[in-house]
């Protein structure tokens, strides 16, 4: 991903129909108030903490300074899958 893509923002948005690990990743960032991992890294200037065994996001710091903690297992329930936005660059 180039620096130009990061500065301009996403080119497309779609809504997923089925759960996947990419949907889980997006769901966790969006619960904390971020668009995706790219926006989080740009704002916080660091990578998020992840669970070592599966790579899921463990802890995120919201824009107001509070922390959001996530389980080791799936957090995005089937009813929330279509509420998640998948951004394309």
Curated annotation (Swiss-Prot):
One of its GO terms (cellular component) is nucleus. Belongs to the MEIG1 family. This is Meiosis expressed gene 1 protein homolog. It comes from Nematostella vectensis.
């Amino acid at each position: 991903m180039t620096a130009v893509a990061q500065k301009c923002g996403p080119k497309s948005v779609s809504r997923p129909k089925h759960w996947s690990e990419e949907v889980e990743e997006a769901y966790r960032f969006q619960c904390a108030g971020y668009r995706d991992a790219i926006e989080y890294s740009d704002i916080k200037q660091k990578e998020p903490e992840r669970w070592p065994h599966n790579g899921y996001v463990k802890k995120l710091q919201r824009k107001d300074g509070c922390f959001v903690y996530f389980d080791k297992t799936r957090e995005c329930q089937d009813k929330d899958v279509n509420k998640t936005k998948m951004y394309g660059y």
